[in-house]
Amino acid sequence: MLRTIDYIRDWTKEANKDEAHVEPSLLNFAVTDGSTVVVSRYITSKTDEAASLHFSCGSSFVETSPGEYRVERLDRNQDVIMVASEPLTFERGDWTAVPTNSILTIKKQTILLHPIIDEYYQEDPLYLRSSTLAESKGLMGSIPLAKAVEKNVPPLEREGRTRPPTAVAHIA
């Protein structure tokens, strides 16, 4: 993946060498060999934000009401791992943003994040990149917000689901 990004970056520089102003290249793409998935979130800029990329993992992906979903985490297993340009659920905690100029690797139940260290690498982790370019192209959004969470309502009921009758009997 890193070599592919290097090739594309170098070819783009060569193709644009006579241009006065060159817009950064946004390179979000995924490759797989059938057992491992490698995904990039990359931009040829040290100051701009790349197009957004998020991932979520858990035990299952459940529909809480028609058209609304959430990731369920019943244990520490990561049976479901999703990668998307934008969060697919209204639960902010369901999604983790992949940092700009990073590689996300998924192999079985293991998720690894690695920075791409090249001329566009930003050493300061607190540096705020500009999202203007990605937003102007419609390539960056935000996590959707759901309605306010009711206090004192257990999580399953808050999602519109209920516990099996046997579980309720054991709790009482």
Model-derived features: positions:
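Conserved short alpha-helical segments that host acidic/polar catalytic motifs at enzyme active sites
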Residues: 1-172
